[in-house]
Amino acid sequence: TKKWHSMCDVRSHWDLMLRSCKQTIFERLEDLQMNVEWSQLFTERKIRENLNENMFRQQKILSIHEIVGTKNAIERNLELNNLDIEYLIKNALKRINDFWKTDFVQALINRFHKQWMVFERKEYGSANGIDLYCSPDIAVKIQNHWHLVRIDMQGKKDSCFEELEAMAMVSWIMGKNMFPRLPDRYVIRIMAWRNGFWNQQRINSSEQKLTQSNYLIESDVGQMQIVLSKLGKDKSMSLIPLARKSSTCRKCALRESCPGGSNLISGNIQQTILELAEYTQE
């Protein structure tokens, strides 16, 4: 549910900076579409506004955690008491300014590509009966192909599934009326911030990759349905599948109410006992 999701959505200050940074890039791109360019001063003002807004929204969520007694643990896990606004602003501006200098954005500024648009992932698309929130950040028509761009604010190490996950953007956009229905008419471009620079990865779409991507999506949905079935009607977390590594739990907002939050090994043992108890009662 939305309420459950908002309770989980507690982030470190660094993650809030990244979220605000991407939000600012979107707003600047939308203005660019209307031939409005930002000054450096205005860009800094917008990133401050967005960061303050996201931090204020998080404080409201933390006030709920304070009522249920989990706020102190969350603040300790995410180091929320250590705040340096100017350091965050400096890093955000570095990312935005360097993004604006990339060949890709410069081509948009100089009107080399006439047809392009910005999307937000709040809009869902449908693929094989599954609602997907995986739109590209930007779609640009270059000659006979649509280039689907994903902006990764803090690029992680390459995953063996990264290409197939990116192909979900093709599934999403093929469900829209104004776009071609042939997978080979798309090119995926991932612009990821890695080691202090914007790196670009290009992936050519194909029917085979799209089929594999859809299979991966269906598999992920199946796993999520298993998680929901474990919650039961009372939405109890007592039998919810736990993480494999304790490092995964470190920044989880629900750590204090999770059966494996304080000790993953102990949590797994307790769940095994509960599952055996349920099995013997059937």
Name the predicted role of every residue range.
Residues 3-7, 150-155, 236-238:
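Glycine- and acidic
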Residues 168, 172-281:
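Metal-dependent nuclease catalytic regions and adjoining charged, substrate-binding loops involved
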Residues 21, 138, 252:
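A residue-level signal for conserved active-site and pocket-lining positions in enzyme catalytic cores
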Residues 34-36, 51, 61-67, 76, ...:
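Hydrophobic transmembrane signal anchors and adjacent membrane-proximal interface regions, especially
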Residues 113-210:
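Mg2+/Mn2+-dependent nuclease catalytic core
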